[in-house]
């Protein structure tokens, strides 16, 4: 297992500056958040030259571009909107391939909760669109990671993958805090995502021992199944980017040390 951070932790940094920060604190990957005007340039509008340059910078630094995290989801009842999102996701798959980024995060929330089969229908619709996207992603050597986020709990993400018939390029981004915030404990959530976790987001705060203990348990469960992906720090526009990176890097070292005991 490896540790990364999202560009939202350092929203004013270029690729070169992100790489310097990663090296300073011992991070092995960087997750690029497009669409938020970060100066890293990993965007759909990036030229072939920019894409090639990013790929070369990451390779030279021996730090992985581990994920691209756009705001793409297929939970809309308007299928025309889903069609537009699918076309956009296809473009992100090309961007990921061009920058040697093996994962793309996608959303699946908010889920409808109005009865009359709306949630079940939404599962099926998301599975349909994600299956189409996963077929394209597989051709490009990219994995799509449906994030456990908001009302998309572990049980919900697991159901979408089940209805999609588990395509090889469709995985889960297990952001544990969203499970805990919606009444789904660690081991309960794990039963629904086991064997299909391709990526994980995490964040902790100073003194939040409960959060640290939950993260340590999540890491223990994933280590037990041989997970070799990234735990990526998601913190949006913190007041002190360097301190945030340092704190999470230290927490990650403690977690790895605990796994070795």
What positions do the PLM features span?
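Hydrophobic faces of well-ordered beta-strands that scaffold small-molecule active sites
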Residues: 3-7, 30-32, 65-70, 104-106, ...
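Active-site-proximal loop/turn and secondary-structure-junction residues that shape catalytic pockets
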Residues: 9-11, 34-36, 72-74, 108-113, ...
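Active-site acidic/histidine proton-transfer and metal-coordination neighborhood
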Residues: 16-17, 52, 57-64, 74-172, ...
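Catalytic domains of carbohydrate-active enzymes, especially glycoside hydrolases
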Residues: 16-35, 100
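Gly/Pro-rich active-site loop or hairpin
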Residues: 19, 39-45, 117, 178-230, ...
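C-terminal helical cap(s) of enzyme catalytic domains, especially alpha/beta-barrels
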Residues: 242-261
